Amino acid sequence: MASIIVRHNESFDDALRRFKRGVAKDGTLQEVRKREFYVKPSVARKLKSEAAQKRARKRARNDH
């Protein structure tokens, strides 16, 4: 979990911005969204395969 220490004369907005950056860097929100619902292993494999195919199509489209 990201944590920060508010610096002397640091505004709340600056501290909040640093905290948000730390949370994004840690991947905390991404992990929470991933674990929000249970996904069966077979469905997870299918989604992973579909995402890989989509990336491959996108990469092939961008490679000239």
Swiss-Prot record:
- Asked whether the UniProt record includes Amino-acid biosynthesis among its keywords, one would answer no
- Gene Ontology CC annotations of this record: ribonucleoprotein complex; ribosome
Q: List, in alphabetical order, the Gene Ontology terms for molecular function in this entry.
A: structural constituent of ribosome
- This protein's source sits in the domain of life called Bacteria
> Which InterPro entries does its entry note?
Ribosomal_bS21, Ribosomal_bS21_CS, Ribosomal_bS21_sf
Q: Name one GO biological process term.
A: translation
Keywords, sorted A to Z: Ribonucleoprotein, Ribosomal protein
The family database entries (PROSITE patterns) matched by this protein are listed as:
RIBOSOMAL_S21
Q: What's this protein's family per the entry? A: Belongs to the bacterial ribosomal protein bS21 family.
This protein is called: Small ribosomal subunit protein bS21
Q: Which organism is it from?
A: Oenococcus oeni (strain ATCC BAA-331 / PSU-1)
